[in-house]
Amino acid sequence: MRLLLFNLATDVNDPVLAFALAWVRRLAPHCEYIDIITMYRGDADLPANVTVYSAGRERGLSKPRRVANFYRHLLRLMATRRYDACFAHMMPLFAGMAGPLLSARGIRTVLWYTHRQRSRQLRLGMAMSWRVVSADATSFPYETDKLRVIGHGIDTDFYAPAAPADWGDTLVVQVGRLAAIKHQATTIQAVAGTAGELALIGGAQAGSASGYEEMLKERAGQVGMNQRCRFTGDLPAAAVRDWYRRATVAVNMSPVGLFDKAALESMACGVPTIVCNPAFAPLLGERADLLLTAGPDDVAGLRDRLERLFALPPEERAAIGRRLRNGVLREHSLDGLSERLLAVLRTGELPESPHSRRSMST
């Protein structure tokens, strides 16, 4: 396959988007070449058959200059290369901008989008795409016959269990940007009613409303968590993984519509993970009562589940973690995602295999 790929950032140091480099590395052996047009180019160790072209955000270029650079790269590549497909990763903007040119050449676009946010930009990108792929049926905000559900792609070799550090039995970890939609305030209040310590991993998103981090710190003080709550800021992936490995319990309060890969990363590390999004229920199995709360504001329910998990013998918590990891391996591994994505790029449909997730597609 000869693949054109659009993404928002190609940078191993990006705290949110660096994971997508693992997708590129896994796709590369199946492709003659991959050409990436990205909004932001940073450091990236990629295979020899992958070439990156940037619109120039890393150089501080204005929007009009970035638009001009995008079309300059696209037109030159279309004049000198042949493509079998285009994959737009969280880039409905580029999918929409390139759509007429690609369609005229018979190049079909597959758009990956996993967020509940609706926008005119997304509608245009969807209109210009042959297929849309998302992690879960609930993680794409529009109903469309174009949607194919392919799961997340978690690097389960990287996110894997290790012998835990001696942090006792009450360390709670929540990973995600500091934002109201992630409901860190719920976790702070819930942990405050237990003997646990809390680590909030992640910083405020650039351009987000100011003051949320300060509000969280104030809330921690109000409930007596000043000495038991750490704010680490943004960390590289290896450091995030190390926090997962130290954790007794991981928490993810992302609501319906946000099928958050951070919850899958902690599960892949073998950590009992409490969630509030029922889309995760198939992974929780018989322990759903212990790992699924009523919603992102359910402080009492989260506190109850934390206390019950803290009270379990370490061996039982480890057994829960193993079952969660096995579910991620089965449904959301990088190999499985690569197989499903390549099938959609080639045929528009999921593969006929145990990895197909056909029961969740629309």
Residue map of PLM features:
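Conserved donor-binding/catalytic core segment of Leloir-type glycosyltransferases
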Residues: 4, 165-182, 187-201
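Short, structured helix-loop element that forms part of the nucleotide-activated donor/catalytic region
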Residues: 44-46, 199-227, 238-239, 243
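Short alpha-helical donor nucleotide-sugar binding micro-motif in glycosyltransferases
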Residues: 234, 242-247
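Aromatic "clamp/platform" in nucleotide-sugar-dependent glycosyltransferases that forms part
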Residues: 255
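Conserved acidic donor-binding segment of nucleotide-sugar-dependent glycosyltransferases
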Residues: 287-300, 307-314
